[in-house]
Amino acid sequence: MPRHKKIAVFFILLLATGLIGMNIYDNQQKKKQEAQEQRQTTTLEKTAIDRTEGDKERANDFTLKTTSGETIRLSDYRGKKVILNFWATWCPPCKAEMPHMQAFHEKHKNDVEIIAVNLTSLDNGNDALEKFIKDYRLTFTIPLDQEGTIGNRYKAYTIPTSYVIDEEGYIQHKVIGPMNEEMMEDMVTSNG
């Protein structure tokens, strides 16, 4: 075999070995990262849920200021069902969900409270928020999570994330992703 063919075969084998090695290394790194994320998720102590009374899960109380400057506490809404929603103005699924949420609010504002927590720490500023509220004609309560602590506590890592909370403050449902009006109707009428 001529010398230049031997060199070509050598480089092809070297390249193939390198590609196989890189693929194995990438797979190992992905597995390590997934394992680390799983450990982090399971070691989170402070969550949205205070476990009491068997398998009922009480929603963790919080205090936030609304867009109008009013201070609200989640526990102030005991005695009424609550849809607790986490969202941001730049989020396309949140944008799709808001007209449904507003329509639901207009029909059920006496029976169900919508608290749509804006993840302000991740959002595009107050001007964008004010424009969004005006454009979508939102009239339900919108508190501001300036630090991101409430969103983290409720594990709103994917938005929108919503919780349906019963009159006694217990979580009935958690929904990751957008809801339509029919889904909201179904969830507030079911008992968990």
Q: What do these predicted ranges mean?
A:
Residues 53-56, 61-82, 106:
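A short beta-strand-turn-helix
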Residues 18, 35-42, 166-192:
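Thiol-/selenol-based redox modules, centered on thioredoxin-like
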Residues 130-168:
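Short, internal strand/loop/helix patches
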Residues 78, 86-106:
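Conserved redox-active cysteine motifs that mediate thiol-disulfide chemistry
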Residues 83-84, 114:
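Hydrophobic beta-strand anchors of alpha/beta hydrolase catalytic cores
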Residues 1-58:
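N-terminal targeting signals for export/organelle localization
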Residues 112-126, 139-147:
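Thiol-based oxidoreductase modules, predominantly thioredoxin-like and allied folds used
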Residues 96, 103-110, 134-137, 141, ...:
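Sec-exported extracytoplasmic/periplasmic mature domains
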